[in-house]
């Protein structure tokens, strides 16, 4: 079976589908407010992606492109993707939907950063992500995990220092 990742529309139908994740998933992964704000702002460039099983949305994530001028994770500093709130509904876990969403993010060829929730580190490790050296000022209590495409590594100096040299 081929798993297809789709950009989700910013509309009330998607908002209704997100309610299922709120009912069955972790509260901190709720994207309902994010989507509501996008509807209000008429933001047609949706950062939301998902996978349908039949007509039911069973997996979803947010994917944001971060400008390289704000990169504090990767060397050389560059644009990267920030993957947020990946979630697969409980009855659909273990079928490759989470992996398909992550592979979709990797397919852009940019570094990817996410924040691992408690007990999800093993999932991210299996998908080629690694924990990055914690920086209190940068990470503010988050647990960043990153995926490095070829030729990219962890940033060891601040971009301002690297550019000044």
UniProtKB/Swiss-Prot annotation:
Keyword Metal-binding carried by entry: no
Residue ranges of the TM segments: none
Keyword Acyltransferase among record annotations: yes
N-acetyltransferase domain boundaries: 8-159
Residues in the signal sequence: none
SUPFAM superfamilies reported for this sequence: Acyl-CoA N-acyltransferases (Nat)
A molecular-function term among this protein's GO annotations: acyltransferase activity, transferring groups other than amino-acyl groups
Alphabetical UniProt keywords: Acyltransferase, Transferase
CDD domains per the UniProt record, alphabetical: NAT_SF
First-tier enzyme category under EC: transferase
EC assignment: 2.3.1.-
Classification via InterPro entries: Acyl_CoA_acyltransferase, GNAT_dom, YlbP
HAMAP family noted in UniProt: Acetyltransf_YlbP (MF_00824)
Protein name (database record): Uncharacterized N-acetyltransferase ABC2369
């Amino acid at each position: 079976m081929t798993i297809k990742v789709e950009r989700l529309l910013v509309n009330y139908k998607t908002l209704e589908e997100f309610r299922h994740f709120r009912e069955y998933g972790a509260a901190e992964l709720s994207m309902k407010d994010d989507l509501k704000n996008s509807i209000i702002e008429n933001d047609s460039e949706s950062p939301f992606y998902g996978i349908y099983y039949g007509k039911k949305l069973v997996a979803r994530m947010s994917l944001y492109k971060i400008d390289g001028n704000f990169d504090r994770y990767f060397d050389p500093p560059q644009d990267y993707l920030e993957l947020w709130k990946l979630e697969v509904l409980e009855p659909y876990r273990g079928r490759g939907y989470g992996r398909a969403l992550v592979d979709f993010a990797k397919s852009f060829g940019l570094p990817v950063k996410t924040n691992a929730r408690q007990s999800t580190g093993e999932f991210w490790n299996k998908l080629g992500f690694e924990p990055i050296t914690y920086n209190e000022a940068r990470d503010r209590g988050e647990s960043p995990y990153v995926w490095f495409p070829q030729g990219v590594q962890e940033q060891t100096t601040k971009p301002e220092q690297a550019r000044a040299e």
